């Protein structure tokens, strides 16, 4: 990251590193004007923290950021909808820090927003496996925001669903079927109201997905 930003202040880096015995694996996406010598940088880092870099085998698998992901970062959702305010022109990825806790607000003893997100993802899997929405791809995720009155959930404020799809779909029809077959059916305790904001693929096109577009480790993601 440091070297990429030194060479190109506008660089984008999403890289995972795994170390096991005498092997170092570096994988991910880098978009940078300069060519980075990853093995050399890894050896320098190993030496800096007190290891002999000659004892390690280094394997790097780096490619450019997915064009679908880049499309959401290059230009924000608001900008794509015509908002020219300076503070909304730059897009952003969907990185976040997630935490959880036990609670009595659901049968699963999990926070209701997480329960709804799990249900949506489960229904996405079912719709893909059963072929109910044939345009679906295997990659996807969901996030739900619930408004509370004290400790009591009151209404669903926002639902975000990013799901891989085949190219050339009818977006409006696709979104409506997702809402009726997946999203609405997952939210039972609190119904979606007219003020609930539902965002489906807010970054735009999501044709490139899975390992072809993203790099990740089990239980750990940038």
Roles of regions detected by a PLM:
Residues 1-5, 90-92, 98-99, 215-222:
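Hydrophobic/aromatic-rich, well-ordered segments within soluble, folded domains that form packed cores
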Residues 1-14, 20, 107, 130:
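N-terminal, positively charged regions that mediate nucleic acid binding
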Residues 1, 42, 183:
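Generic structural marker for isolated residues within well-ordered, non-membrane alpha-helices
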Residues 10-70:
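Conserved beta-ketoacyl condensing-enzyme motif
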Residues 10-12, 139, 219:
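Short beta-strand-initiation
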Residues 28-36, 204-221:
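Short glycine/threonine-rich loop-to-helix capping motif typified by GTGT followed
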């Amino acid at each position: 990251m440091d070297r990429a930003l030194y060479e190109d202040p506008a660089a984008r880096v999403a890289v995972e590193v795994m170390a096991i015995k005498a092997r170092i694996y570096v994988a991910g996406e880098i978009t940078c004007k300069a060519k980075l010598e990853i093995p050399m940088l890894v050896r320098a880092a190993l030496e800096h923290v007190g290891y002999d870099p000659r004892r390690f085998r280094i394997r790097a698998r780096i490619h450019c950021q997915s064009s679908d992901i880049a499309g959401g970062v290059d230009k924000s959702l608001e900008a794509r909808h015509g908002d020219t305010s300076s503070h909304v022109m730059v897009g952003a990825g969907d990185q976040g820090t997630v935490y959880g806790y036990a609670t009595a607000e659901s049968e699963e003893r999990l926070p209701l927003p997480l329960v709804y997100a799990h249900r949506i993802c489960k229904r996405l899997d079912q719709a893909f496996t059963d072929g109910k929405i044939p345009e679906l791809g295997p990659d996807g995720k969901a996030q739900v925001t619930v408004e509370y009155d004290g400790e009591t959930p009151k209404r669903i404020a926002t639902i975000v669903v990013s799901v891989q799809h085949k190219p050339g779909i009818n977006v409006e029809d696709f979104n409506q079927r997702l809402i009726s077959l997946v999203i609405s059916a997952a939210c039972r305790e609190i119904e979606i109201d007219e003020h609930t904001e539902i965002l489906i693929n807010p970054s735009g096109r999501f044709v490139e997905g899975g390992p072809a577009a993203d790099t990740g480790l089990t239980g750990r993601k940038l």
